[in-house]
Amino acid sequence: LDFFITEIPEEVFTYSESDQMHFEAPRSDIYPYLLVNIGSGVSMIKVSGPRTYERVGGTSLGGGTLWGLLSLLNGSRTFDEMLALAERGDNTKVDMLVGDIYGTDYGKIGLKSSTIASSFGKVFKMKREAEREAEDSGGLNNKDYLSEFSTLSSDSEINKSPPFAAADISRSLLYAISNNIGQIAYLQSEKHSLSTIYFGGSFIRGHRQTINTLSYAIKFWSNGQKKAYFLRHEGFLGAVGAFLKRQPLNWGRRNSFGDGIVNSLGNTIRDDTQKDLKPALHNEST
């Protein structure tokens, strides 16, 4: 990560709904910082110097959790398919919001009506309402209702569409996992007095909703005092690290195409193909 931060132009950026992408200039005073690497699980690394680091925390709820649960819930087969579904989904049809509970913002504790109060909360609410309706109309207790529900479920599945769309479920679960990671990352940064938080790993994949959720979580829990930083090549930290460990000659931007190289005749050669490199954020059509 040090290499990406200090050597690669237009590599590190912040993200928000108002100022979607803002590139950070490379800097030399990068330590200390927290690296949140999100793959199948999540590891959080405190980096204090070029060769000084320690794993300070993490969580088992990561990309593997999203993939595993969505493959069971909606039959998605690939991670990109799940992200595409999440793009089209509406989590408010699945999640219970503050506005669903109070009817408006809860200003006393600073919660907007659009804040998620309970991930998948409307699923539970619908189940409870169905149970009460069955008890009131058929005189069934909970045990009898559940037994009858399981008996009738096969017939109802034939005649009725699922109450929750696959896209809505995908978006809700993506938000749940991303928000959880963001909150834990903030808590670790507070515990270890770290003001800079970088997010990496193949879970992110340049996905706009994932990046926005992680960024919002850090901003929310820190009351705007901290930012989440992201990388254009977030999925290649391990590969580039293994490459650099071999200490290749002339590594870094020295003699790179980005700065121009000098050929045997002493002429500077520039590579104009590097001009339009942008982060691979998924757009709305993904």
Question: Model regions: which residues?
Answer:
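Glycine-rich phosphate-binding/hydrolytic loop that grips phosphoryl groups
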Residues: 1-7, 66-71, 78, 83, ...
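Conserved phosphate-binding catalytic cores of ATP/NTP-utilizing and phosphoryl-transfer enzymes
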Residues: 1-33, 48, 243
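Intrinsically disordered, low-complexity domain-flanking/linker segments in eukaryotic proteins
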Residues: 10-26, 131-160, 255-282
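Short beta-strand segments
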Residues: 33-41, 45, 85-86, 266
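Adenine-nucleotide phosphate-binding core of ATP-dependent small-molecule kinases
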Residues: 109-196, 203-207
